[in-house]
UniProtKB/Swiss-Prot annotation:
Role description: Catalyzes the conversion of glucosamine-6-phosphate to glucosamine-1-phosphate.
SUPFAM superfamilies with a match to the protein in the record: Phosphoglucomutase, C-terminal domain, Phosphoglucomutase, first 3 domains
Cofactor note: Binds 1 Mg(2+) ion per subunit.
One cellular-component annotation, GO: cytosol
Post-translational modification Phosphoserine, affected residues: 102
Keyword Phosphoprotein listed: yes
Species, as recorded: Oleidesulfovibrio alaskensis (strain ATCC BAA-1058 / DSM 17464 / G20) (Desulfovibrio alaskensis)
InterPro entries reported for this sequence: A-D-PHexomutase_a/b/a-I, A-D-PHexomutase_a/b/a-I/II/III, A-D-PHexomutase_a/b/a-II, A-D-PHexomutase_a/b/a-III, A-D-PHexomutase_C, A-D-PHexomutase_C_sf, A-D-PHexomutase_CS, Alpha-D-phosphohexomutase_SF
Superkingdom of the organism of origin: Bacteria
Name of the molecule in the record: Phosphoglucosamine mutase
Amino acid sequence: MTTRLFGTDGLRGQVNIYPMVPDMALRLGLAAGTFFRNGNKRHRVVIGKDTRLSGYVFEMALTSGLCAAGMDVFLVGPLPTPAVAFLTRNMRADLGVVISASHNPFHDNGIKFFDKDGFKLPDSQEDAITEMVLNQNHRWDYPEPERVGRAHKIQDAPGRYIVYLKNSFPSTLTLDGMKVVLDCANGANYRVAPLALEELGAEVIRIGTSPDGLNINHKCGSLYPELAAQRVRETGADIGLALDGDADRLIVVDEKGTVLDGDQIMAICAMDMMEKGRLPENRLVATVMSNMALEVFMKERGGSLLRTPVGDRHVVEAMRRTGAAMGGEQSGHLVFMEYGTTGDGLLAALQLLRIMREKNRPLSELAGLLTPFPQQLINVHVQRKIPFEQCPEIGRAVEQAEKELAGRGRVLLRYSGTESVARVMVEGEDDALVGRLAAGLAETLQQHLR
């Protein structure tokens, strides 16, 4: 069986520690270029990155490998992950590559691939690439010297993405008179997001738009929405938008400074789409982490919630399989299949702003559609990731917690696909009970997974 090199969101790790080393990036470029090369036509790949200092290292290594494999490389510089997915389709490329570790600190980085249609690669293709990369005896099928690829910088890539975003917003509407607090996490959207909102007429109050290579996600962005909330209260803004480092997720703050997560944003957007007949079979796709209240919300309105494993990749796969138009994660990955192929924080923000404009209602009123059940999420750092069912003590603790919830709540244990972390999630009707059970389960995991 092929060793899994890729997690739920590509390859990720600490810079200059295996596997996030330049040699790995070079071999990944060679392998991906070889795998996607087909026939004698010129092959093209789009490479984008976020604002991490190490992005230059992996950009150059990947470019070398891809060019050596016969791919022409289009370098678009710091741009959001969804922008690279869009540009891969828009530029008729064979492959898209993003260099980013998303919401992680600057000392981490990652590499993920998109196919020609802008979708993340399936396991089978990632495994084929992995097999070439890890086989030190693999004989590379290098092209003839005249078929070696060229590298080009694409200067107008940000402008193309802005036009794409604005085309998702009705031409009959503007954001004139709206005050928007925008936190770009010193990440990939630091240039594009403010410009797109300002071109639509909004007054933008900027946070996290001065990247220095080291400050990406540092006490800002979607993991620190209280920063945007404070600025909303100070300035009287209509809304706060907090993006993560690669801008594929969104957390929102209403005009009162209340933080809204992905579940609440999905409820608002799903309701709007159901009213307009734009949500096929009134089906919404979300992960096992989404609050039970979202499931109840959809059922009460004649709809349904289809749950998937964690990761926007799994959400998108389920959407494609079922024909769903919208899906997302509580963490803020939101996918609108009419417009894009992956989570896009700014595109999701524009959909929310459109609804606010069309209904002429403040965000706090719209958010009243969904009242989340009490939920507690605890991250437990682990030394090993053994299957939970192989530890009887963990099984007994889960069984006891479910017994106390008496069918009026959920317990979920899972490992992170990108970090050495086990996640404990408990939700139910009683806040105190939920907190106590979550803390007890976290302690059990700490004892048995060290």
